[in-house]
Amino acid sequence: MGLKNQLRNLAEKRSSDFFGVAPVSRFKGAPKFHKPRDILPESKSVLSVGIKIPQGVRKANHRSFSKKGMRDAIFIYQMHGYVTINNKLNKTAYSLANFLENQGFVSTPIPASAPSNRKDLVGIFSNRHAAVAAGQANFGWNTLAITEEAGPRVRWVSVLTSADIHPDPLLKGDICDREDCNKCVEVCPVEAIPDTESVELTMEGKKFVYSNLIKERCRTGGVSGLSTRMAEQKLELPTNPGPEDYLKALDKESSWHKMERIASMCGRCIIECPVGS
């Protein structure tokens, strides 16, 4: 059995639904300090692993946001739509990296979540971009990695490695249909997803276009209580919030909202996307 199949089998044994490989050359357009070789100079390949959010967990999110719903159902989504999956992904990434290192290849597992730079709201490495680069997904207008099977309802993790592994091809065509769908723009409670302003990215000649997400509105809206289910407050959101506005919102946060905010994520652009099941 070849190395790639061994890695795929290891990922599948740990309940992973997606597995792909990308060469580091597909990340040449990444920002400085966020390329694979900025993190691991010896890296030649990037592994991308994904786990789907169960449909029942997705329904719990719907239930909590519906007018007649039970708002506490958001805790189900918080635990099993985020925490449980991210823990499984982190353990899988560690196992893959450890397996590769035992084969003589230097490898670095990337955390599944938690941005490393909270001021600029960016992580050390984009697991979403890795999923697209590894042929597992395409970008949606909501900036998320969209799969045909589950839409954006997949969480991802990556492993950088010095092993030169045969890559998967990029997906052909588009999965997100911007001509007939504008759902993510419509459902965003803080208008963080612009209707027309976009970002373009090219990998091996294929152009990807997605929205220029206003990350500060997305983040500050959650702290302000404008986009979350457990909101115990509703603070006014500035027109063009920046990092300092996010800090100001944290200072104004009520005690009840602060205690419940751990389960106060929004996720409308993930849950309401009509692609996949």
Regions found by a protein language model. Name each.
Residues 30, 78-277:
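Catalytic cores of enzyme domains
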